[in-house]
Amino acid sequence: MKRCDRLIDVGRRQFLAGAAVAAAGAAATALPARSAGAGPSPALVDYPSIKLANLTDLQVDQPFDVAYPDGDSPGVLLKLGRAVDGGVGPDADIVAFSTLCPHKGFPLHYVADDKSLDCPGHYSRFDCEKQGMQIWGQATQNLPQFRLRVDDAGDIYAEGVDELIYGRLNNVLAG
């Protein structure tokens, strides 16, 4: 068998496709890598400190509707009845989350039986006892949790958000 009989005839389309992939790879390696400390995360900005409720307003497994960091961002304040990571208050059992599903922005509802926030749109579920960790569904990130503080009078303040709220480029909107 002749050596040239083993060669494969690459058509024009295959050649151009291969050249395009090679050019894209060369361009990607020529771009400077983005530094990890290049700028603040969209979720790590200056947040307002807003009073959400008082300890006396909350009952175990009864969601308390709130809005943070502004009126266009619905959330829920929950007293879970047992201490959890990220919980505040005398029993470390109070947490707050955005109620916009990070997948498509559907409004979430609280299910007391398993202490989860569930999405009716595409069935994502988030564990309120595990800092809003996704436990099921289409979402690709955990639920944004509000950073809380309780003062000596029992007032509960939200002072930040740990993830980007659905539909926003920045959690704190320009006034």
Regions found by a protein language model. Name each.
Residues 108-113, 125-132:
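Iron-sulfur (Fe-S) cluster-binding segments and ferredoxin-like electron-carrier domains
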Residues 115-123, 133-143:
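Short cysteine/histidine-rich metal-coordination sites, predominantly Zn2+-binding motifs
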Residues 34-114, 144, 149-175:
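N-terminal pre-ligand scaffold of iron-sulfur
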Residues 1-23:
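N-terminal secretory signal peptides and thylakoid transit peptides that target proteins
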Residues 29-32:
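C-terminal segment of classical bacterial N-terminal signal peptides
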